[in-house]
Amino acid sequence: QVYGNLLSGVATPAFEGTPTRTGYVFKGWNPEVAATVTGNATYIATWGEDKNNNGIADDEETKYTVRYTDGVDEEVIFADQVYRNLLSGVDTPAFKGTPKREGYVFKGWNPAVAEKVTGDATYAATWGEDKNNNGIDDNEETKYTVTYKDGVDGEEVFADQVYGNLLSGVATPAFEG
């Protein structure tokens, strides 16, 4: 907007409306607008980037950290993945890769990963034991029982040997005796 033929000492005319720019926030004028006209002046809009489109310049916002950990104390399954300087409202960065741990299956993250960043967050991997290495949490599998009986009625040649809670694919327990 250009204002011409202004007399020295009159109030500097205000910009009509609000300057807008996609992905940015209007921060003000450079130089600062003088209260009165003292000569020719050009005022340049200054902008602050607003990646999360919340109306606050990114350089004025709190930044957050998202961390993915293996969830295992005293052992390193994988190095933490850490994402820093995240703005509120942006998509939560995903874990890169697939968590793997020998003898276990990955069950998910605790707490569940939020869709958007709202603050600092740590997500710990959760694991289910997988003794038979079939890719299924042992607690979710059907368990089997193997029983050895003497096959004699009315006489006990040997006591029944019962092996319970066996997983598919594990070695059959041997008869003892």
Question: What does each model-found stretch correspond to?
Answer:
Residues Q1-G177:
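Secondary-structure capping and domain/repeat boundary segments
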